[in-house]
């Protein structure tokens, strides 16, 4: 049976993803900031290596838009470096990685459907 690690499992989207995985009887382990900080590369490697998931669904993100303006370094640590840490950990054990983001990474382009290869132009992190 496939083993899936879900980061950001206590978040709005994470709870729904965990519920959907459980309904499909997927062996899923949800983690959140209480378990480890995705910005801490050593902690990410330790968790991912110990869990040895076949796939990682990376939902952990710094989502407080107001605080992101006053705490840009924390936002970058979680959203950019945290994602890089998850990519590196997945590569190290040969796990598949699914990254969730939002259309905001493409900038202000109303009524446009974007593809996976479209250039990003985020106004924020």
PLM region descriptions:
Residues 41-78, 89:
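NAD(P)H-binding glycine-rich loop region in Rossmannoid oxidoreductase-like domains
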Residues 7, 31, 56-60, 97-103:
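SDR active-site strand-loop-helix element
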Residues 24, 51, 92-93:
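Helix C-cap/helix->beta junction micro-motif
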Residues 70, 77-85, 92, 96, ...:
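Catalytic helix-loop patch of NAD(P)-dependent Rossmann-fold dehydrogenases
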Residues 2-23:
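N-terminal Rossmann NAD(P)H-binding glycine-rich loop of SDR-like oxidoreductase domains
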Residues 22-46:
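Adenosine-cofactor binding site in Rossmann-like domains, unifying the SAM/SAH pocket
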Residues 14, 65-66, 106-109:
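Glycine/Thr-rich phosphate-binding loops of Rossmann-like dinucleotide-binding domains
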């Amino acid at each position: 049976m496939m083993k899936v690690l879900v980061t950001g499992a206590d978040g709005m989207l994470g709870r729904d993803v965990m519920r959907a995985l459980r309904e499909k009887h997927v062996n899923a382990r949800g983690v959140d900031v209480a378990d480890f900080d995705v910005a801490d590369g050593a902690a990410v490697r330790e968790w991912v290596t110990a869990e040895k998931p076949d796939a990682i669904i990376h939902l952990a993100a710094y989502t407080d838009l107001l605080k992101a303006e006053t705490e840009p370094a924390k936002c970058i640590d979680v959203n950019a470096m945290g994602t890089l840490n998850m990519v590196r950990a997945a590569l190290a054990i040969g796990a598949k990685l699914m990254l969730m983001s939002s259309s905001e990474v493409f900038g202000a382009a109303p009524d446009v459907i974007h593809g996976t290869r479209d250039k990003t132009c985020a106004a924020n992190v």
